[in-house]
Amino acid sequence: NEEEFLAGFRYALLTRHYDGIFKGVLHTKNDSVADVVKNEGTEVLYGDSYFYEELLGLKFKITPFSFFQTNSLGAEVLYETAREFILGDDKDSLNGKTVYDLYSGTGTIAQLMAPVCKEVVGVEIVEEAVCAAKENAALNGLDNCKFIAGDVLKVLDEIEEKPDYIILDPPRDGIHPKAIGKIIEYGVENMVYISCKPTSLARDLQIFMARGYRVEKICCVDMFPNTYHVETVVKLSLKKDTPKIEVTMEPDEESNYTPQEKATYSKIKEYVKDKYGVNVHTSYIAQVKRM
């Protein structure tokens, strides 16, 4: 029967030799016919239902329902790369600034950035991960992290704090196009996008680049050796308008010349809004003008 099978399974695991510490055995019930692990109840057969992992000087509580990189040493390389992309040579560049960590999971990146900025706001749709993020922040003595449970697309309309920097670490399918639009509307000068699926990344980058952002840096981290999977870190920056030289023309007194009124950014935005009912960002207008 099931109890005898589980008892034998537990015994087989406990009597083996391990280099590390054996923390626990959990039995997750799943009677679904689908090829997916759907939790219908979890039973602790031995030990604890969690363990602690240390990463870049911080401590994280990991549960079966927390998203955390399986390759811990590789995760240190990944997050150190992301931190270097964000801070660059100026370690005080985020001093006094607000950072958004969107799709924040258990808040790993948010907590790595918290010591060097005023506040980090993490948004994650999985409530268990948000609870773990709050617990981990308290564990690490970080009081400037705020984690919100909800869909990024909806939560962005509710957050009062405006970001100075945005970090993106979405699931494999990437970012919803409408969410990308809202992210771009903030007009932050720099962003870092961490992706685990190159095709989703390529699709999303096309949207960012069409709206005025450009790729400054890109780095791939081989988190899963001997597989085709790879994590990619991309730094995006908002394109600056091309430098202009101001020229003043003063026609002769006898001339009948009247300067033609030019379309300003505000007039273009007003025209598009009236004619098509669409709000356009200044950076998008600048991109079209350059084309």
Predicted regions mapped to residue ranges:
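Residues in the helix-turn-helix
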Residues: Y284
